[in-house]
């Protein structure tokens, strides 16, 4: 289980999170739901190590991950970014194997086998040699998910996974996330869309701006 205990975060004089505690059950999909400016993306960035908490603890199965960097936690916590962040000069397969070979020190052969397995799972086996400009928004989203999964994380975080897509694709994204449910992986999804949240959530955490 992933837990945050009594965490706070400010930017300058503006307090974003104030003494927040939540648990994220293993094998479940937890949705962090709320309006823009409510702190949901800040919370996700702190969980993933992209930002640091001002105070409080982050625990994964009792292991203290508080304020460790995203790179230090990359084998434990994966992130699917809102804008996908694919490298345009690399093809799909190269995008996916880059981190496992550099961070996890996997051989190129092992990383490629894992990447192809992820692409097959996500229905992209025929796109491994394509570049990002050749992909639709939904395909880029699935490549970003495959890249995160290739790091074999125990926690997979999504930042507004439908915001960069056409409205009609939100159901496809929900189906992908539901199909990835596993007893060994916690999924955390940030969204402002209550309809999307209802489709996927085992647990919902609502956040509001601090007044």
Task: Describe the role of every protein-language-model region.
Residues 131-135, 139:
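Conserved ABC ATPase signature
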Residues 48:
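Helix-to-loop junction immediately C-terminal to a conserved catalytic motif
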